[in-house]
């Protein structure tokens, strides 16, 4: 007879993890899930093993709203190695071409300018995007290249930090779907020398406060501290979580009276005052404005439920 699966506890919120280098985003996710003993967990856009920085991890009911963070802006610090191109566009790949670095400061400035604003980007073969139901990196590992369509992205800000020898450091504020490795690879080709990423740190996701980031080591230390104090680890861990609706913080709020929210929570569109003309909204209820889910304004101006909170912390 097989043992019953361990369910974990109902804990809801978003942990802003400072991902360490050399670990996959999924490995980090599983460690956080175990530390919190959470019944559900999911991240909001993977970071490459080489990369460090902000990785929002959603626990419990917050996983329902992680999709809204996938659409948010990101900010990165990146260091590129000039003169070498790799098959993965980063230091984890194999060098496929080496060329001298001969561009001038003026040529660099002109090249950087072409990556600012609304541009189109062809994703790397080493990405998790799918082609005919299979991830691109699975084809790449078999030595197969498949067609990829250019996708529109926006680079809101591309800051030059330094150029020393064969290293170039930049800061990038960009829209969803932007591959920093691809920007560096494309920039290297435009400069005629090739380039690949040797350091990448995600500085920010959406409007999350950077000072709320924590490391795996800090989480483990809190667990050990709780053991020494003979208290539940949750007393020290749970205050680190951001609210479960924080992934959707960019959307306007509609507060429903309790007389209307009961219908909304049962899956029915409701009418109320002070709603926008269209689009998605965060829906709260009552005087304490408890978050109950995401809604969308329908053609009749009603708030229609889209994603509802089923469980809620007591």
Swiss-Prot record:
A Pfam entry, by short name: TruB_N
Protein residues bound to substrate: 43, 76, 179, 200
Enzyme Commission number(s) from the entry: 5.4.99.25
Superkingdom as given in the UniProt entry: Bacteria
GO biological processes: mRNA pseudouridine synthesis; tRNA pseudouridine synthesis
Keywords, ordered alphabetically: Isomerase, tRNA processing
Isomerase in keyword set: yes
Keyword tRNA processing belongs to the record: yes
Substrates-to-products reaction catalysed: uridine(55) in tRNA = pseudouridine(55) in tRNA
Top-level enzyme category: isomerase
InterPro entries in UniProt: PsdUridine_synth_cat_dom_sf (IPR020103), PsdUridine_synth_N (IPR002501), PUA-like_sf (IPR015947), PUA_sf (IPR036974), tRNA_psdUridine_synth_TruB (IPR014780), tRNA_sdUridine_synth_fam1_C (IPR015240), TruB_C (IPR032819)
Molecular function via GO: RNA binding; tRNA pseudouridine(55) synthase activity
Active-site residues, as the UniProt record annotates them: 48
HAMAP family associated with the record: TruB_bact
Free-text function comment from the UniProt entry: Responsible for synthesis of pseudouridine from uracil-55 in the psi GC loop of transfer RNAs.
PANTHER family the record matches: PSEUDOURIDYLATE SYNTHASE TRUB1, TRNA-PSEUDOURIDINE SYNTHASE
Family: Belongs to the pseudouridine synthase TruB family. Type 1 subfamily.
Annotated NCBIfam families: TruB (TIGR00431)
Protein name stated in the entry: tRNA pseudouridine synthase B
Source species of the chain: Citrobacter koseri (strain ATCC BAA-895 / CDC 4225-83 / SGSC4696)
């Amino acid at each position: 007879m097989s043992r019953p699966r361990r369910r974990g506890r109902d804990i809801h919120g978003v942990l802003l993890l400072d991902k360490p280098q050399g670990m996959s985003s999924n490995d980090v996710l599983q460690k956080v899930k175990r530390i919190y003993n959470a019944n559900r967990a999911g991240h909001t856009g993977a970071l490459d093993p080489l990369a460090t920085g902000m990785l929002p991890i959603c626990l419990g009911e917050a996983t329902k709203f992680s999709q809204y963070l996938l659409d948010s802006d990101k900010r990165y610090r990146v260091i590129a190695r000039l003169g070498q191109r790799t098959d993965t566009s980063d230091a984890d790949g194999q060098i496929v071409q080496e060329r001298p670095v001969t561009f001038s400061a003026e040529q660099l400035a002109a090249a950087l300018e072409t990556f600012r604003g609304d541009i189109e980007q062809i994703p790397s073969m080493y990405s998790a995007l799918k082609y005919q139901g299979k991830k691109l990196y699975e084809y790449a590992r078999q030595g197969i290249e498949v067609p990829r369509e250019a996708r529109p992205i926006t680079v809101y800000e591309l800051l030059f930090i330094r150029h020393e020898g064969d290293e170039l450091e930049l800061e990038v504020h960009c829209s969803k779907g932007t591959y920093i490795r691809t920007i560096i690879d494309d920039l290297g080709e435009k400069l005629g020398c090739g380039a690949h990423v040797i350091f990448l740190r995600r500085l920010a996701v959406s409007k999350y406060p950077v000072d709320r980031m924590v490391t795996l080591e800090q989480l483990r230390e809190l667990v050990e501290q709780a053991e020494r104090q003979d208290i539940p680890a949750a007393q020290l861990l749970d205050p680190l979580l951001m609210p479960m609706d924080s992934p959707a913080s960019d959307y306007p709020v509609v507060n429903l009276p309790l007389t209307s929210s009961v219908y909304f929570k049962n899956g029915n569109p409701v009418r109320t005052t002070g709603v926008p003309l269209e689009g998605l909204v965060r829906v709260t209820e009552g005087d304490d404005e408890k978050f109950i889910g995401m809604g969308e304004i329908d053609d009749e101006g009603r708030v229609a439920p889209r994603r509802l909170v089923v469980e809620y912390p007591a």
